[in-house]
Amino acid sequence: MNTVPGVDRSTGSLGQGISAACGMALGAKVKGRQSRVYTLLGDGEIQEGQVWEACMFASHYQLDNLCVIIDNNGLQIDGDVAKVMSPYPIVDKLEAFGFHVEAIDGHDFTAIEAALAKAKTVKGKPTAIVMKTVKGKDVSFMENEAGWHGVAPNDAQYEQAMAELTAKLNELEGK
């Protein structure tokens, strides 16, 4: 695969990404590499048992070169994450599994940069960054709508979304 430099694999919603990341992180440690491994999970994805098995593995092997990033927007393809199969409280569970946890606003780039920097300094345990986000943020017809999970907009919706996001970007940049 590896069509994007630095991205070794894409995974689906069944929790396989963190298991692959654990293998990559352990392999790097065994080979004496200083590389870091990052994996992105959704809050619906962490309902899968494989995720928690991988968390045990990461903690047991002290994979301090592993950073798990969780998008906690409360929605999944079937609706409200808490109603489908609640993984909450995410932070408490990850800490119980031996992770260093940073809970941040996933729309705050300064907080994201700080959490990623902190992850590099943690020794002896993996890091999880739990990012509270809003699905479809700043797109009027997508925001907080589970129905947009895995659905592409049509041409008119795409144009509207891009116009709204461009307006928001201009606002943030003071234009």
Residue ranges and their predicted role:
Residues 41-48, 72-76, 107-109:
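Acidic, glycine-rich active-site loops and adjacent beta-strand->loop/helix elements
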Residues 61-88, 92-94:
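Histidine/lysine/aspartate-rich catalytic loop segments that bind and position anionic ligands
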